């Protein structure tokens, strides 16, 4: 229990209770309350696409630095 300001103490929120448990849920930026909410849906999907792009770029940068070519016996 932790105090929050001048009000009554409240229980501490555990981070593991807030995180999704399924692997597919972790891929999404967020979850919309309504599937008909187009703005929310676009925002959540945009985060997923940006993370995929970042991962692809990181992999390519490592490849250019020669980190992924060690099995070939050459530097890229």
From Swiss-Prot:
Region (Endothelin-like): 30-44
Transmembrane segments: none
InterPro entries in the record: Endothelin (IPR020475), Endothelin_toxin_CS (IPR019764), Endothln-like_toxin (IPR001928)
Record's keyword terms, sorted: Cleavage on pair of basic residues, Secreted, Vasoactive, Vasoconstrictor
Presence of the UniProt keyword Secreted in the record: yes
GO cellular component terms attached to this protein's record: extracellular space
Recorded superkingdom: Eukaryota
SMART domains: END
Function in brief: Endothelins are endothelium-derived vasoconstrictor peptides. Probable ligand for G-protein coupled receptors EDNRA and EDNRB which activates PTK2B, BCAR1, BCAR3 and, GTPases RAP1 and RHOA cascade in glomerular mesangial cells. Also binds the DEAR/FBXW7-AS1 receptor. Promotes mesenteric arterial wall remodeling via activation of ROCK signaling and subsequent colocalization of NFATC3 with F-actin filaments. NFATC3 then translocates to the nucleus where it subsequently promotes the transcription of the smooth muscle hypertrophy and differentiation marker ACTA2.
Family: Belongs to the endothelin/sarafotoxin family.
Name the record gives this protein: Endothelin-1
Annotated organism of origin: Macaca fascicularis (Crab-eating macaque)
Lineage: Eukaryota, Metazoa, Chordata, Craniata, Vertebrata
